[in-house]
C-alpha cells in the first residue's frame, strides 16, 4: 500500500492521528505523550527538515528538555550511527573508569536501553549552541537522512563533527514492535505522514515542580498553542493499521 493510500484510510480511523499527520506534513509542531507506565512525559515534536531557529527557541524556552533528533533505523544503519552505550563499551576496553559508568542491564527504570547515539554539530557551525546554529545542524540531519534513504552514498562525517550540541537518537530496528519511546513514536508518525523520518523531540518540563510537565498541564499548553496532543497508544494503534496490507 502506498503512503498516500494508507493516509486516506487513516482519515477514517482516528481524527486525532489525521490532524497530527496533517500538521507534520505542513512542518508544524505537535505533542506526543508516551504513556503513564513508561516515562510519563510529553515531548514537543517537529520534522527536522522544517526546523527554524524560532522553533529551537520555542523548545528551549517552553519545553526545556534536551533537544534531540530521532532518526529512522534504516537511515541510522546507512549512516553508520552507533549507540552511545556501544561506543563507551568499546572504549572501556582500554579504560576501566568508562567500564564502570556505561549503561548496564536494569539501569533504566523505563526501558531496556537508551536510544542515544552521537552528539553532533554541523561543520558549518561555529560553536554549535546558538539557536540558529542548532537549527542548521538539525535541518542538515534531516537532509542527510533523506539522502541516505534515497540510496545516495553519503558520508556522515563529511557534514558533521562530534562532540556537538544536538543529540541523535537511533530508533530501534523493530520500531514500535521493539520499543515504544518518543524516538520510535515520532519516527513511526513520520513514516505514516510520508515525510523524512528524522524528528526533533524535546521533553516538556515543569518550572514549578522541577519534574516533567504533567499530562494534564501538557494538554492545557497544547490547547493554548493550537497543538495536536497524541498519546503513545494512539500512535501504536494507527501504525499497526498503516503497516498492514489493507484497512
From Swiss-Prot:
Give an example GO molecular function.
Answer: magnesium ion binding
Give binding positions for Mg(2+) 2: 39
Concerning HAMAP family, the annotation shows: RibB (MF_00180)
What are the recorded Gene Ontology BP terms? riboflavin biosynthetic process
Gene Ontology CC annotations of this record: cytosol
Q: Which cysteines are joined by disulfide bonds?
A: none
Q: Pathway, per UniProt?
A: Cofactor biosynthesis; riboflavin biosynthesis; 2-hydroxy-3-oxobutyl phosphate from D-ribulose 5-phosphate: step 1/1
UniProt xrefs under NCBIfam families = ribB
Q: Which SUPFAM superfamilies match?
A: YrdC/RibB
Entry's EC annotation: 4.1.99.12
Names of required cofactors: Mg(2+); Mn(2+)
Task: Please identify the protein, giving its name as recorded.
Answer: 3,4-dihydroxy-2-butanone 4-phosphate synthase
**Self-association and partners:** Homodimer.
Which chain positions carry the site (Essential for catalytic activity)?
165, 203
Residues that, per the record, bind Mg(2+) 1: 39
Q: Where does D-ribulose 5-phosphate bind?
A: 38-39, 43, 179-183, 203
Catalytic function, reaction form? D-ribulose 5-phosphate = (2S)-2-hydroxy-3-oxobutyl phosphate + formate + H(+)
